[in-house]
Regions:
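N-terminal hydrophobic signal/anchor transmembrane helix of membrane proteins
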Residues: 78, 86-89, 95-105, 186-202
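Short secondary-structure transition hinges
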Residues: 104-145, 169, 173-181
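N-terminal intrinsically disordered/low-complexity leader segments
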Residues: 1-19, 202
Length: 202
């Protein structure tokens, strides 16, 4: 009586997954959470998926294409999260909730957040690759209750994003650890001062 080698029935779970653009991008997001932005390559992701690097080119054109797709997904995640946490809240309460969620996302997903910092938001002929007003919509909706017109609310939303992003980057690069300041209190006070000044901009 003969028996088949044990390896005959082994299957790589990742290989059993049917690959398409979505599964490749989802795998890249998980990879970023675990290994970080700099470690993401076509070959490294292929190993993660139990396949060969060239096979991924059936689903993404290049590493740059994959990174742009990943960044788009990260932006969708962040905007969706901001809509969720601001739902049912108004004015400063909504702004504080969004700011806290934004900072938390960056801390919990530093690899994904790097997608916002490591690539330009312009294409090869300097055209924007994102719809900035659509991305700012959660903030502009919360800010709009202060009676600001659409353009002023948008500009204020960009200022809020700049403040949050700048603070997060100081934390992620270790700057905040080197000064005698409670980062939680400092962040909350920064956002509070921003919200308090909105009524004066009408």
């Amino acid at each position: 009586m003969t028996t088949e080698p044990a390896t005959a029935h082994r299957r790589n779970p990742a290989r059993a997954t049917r690959l398409n653009r979505d599964t490749v991008v989802n795998a890249a997001l998980s990879f970023l959470d675990r290994a970080g932005w700099d470690a993401l390559t076509i070959n490294a992701l292929a190993v993660e998926l139990g396949t060969k690097g060239p096979s991924l080119y059936n689903h993404v054109d290049s590493l740059d294409d994959l990174r742009h797709e990943v960044r788009g997904r990260v932006l969708v995640e962040i905007v969706g999260m901001l809509h969720t946490v601001s739902s049912g809240r108004t004015s400063e309460d909504a702004i504080l909730a969004m700011a806290g969620a934004y900072r938390s996302y960056a801390h919990h997903h530093p690899g994904r957040y790097a997608a916002l910092t490591r690539m330009p938001f312009l294409d090869d002929v300097n055209r924007p690759t994102i719809d900035a007003r659509e991305l700012a919509k959660p903030a502009t909706e919360a800010i709009g209750v202060y009676g600001l017109d659409e353009d002023t609310a948008f500009h204020a939303g960009v200022e809020l994003w700049a403040a949050m992003h700048g603070f997060v980057m100081l934390e992620m690069t270790g700057f905040m650890a080197g000064i005698e300041m409670d980062p939680d209190i400092a962040f909350t006070e920064m956002v509070h001062r921003f919200a308090s000044g909105l009524a004066e901009r009408r």
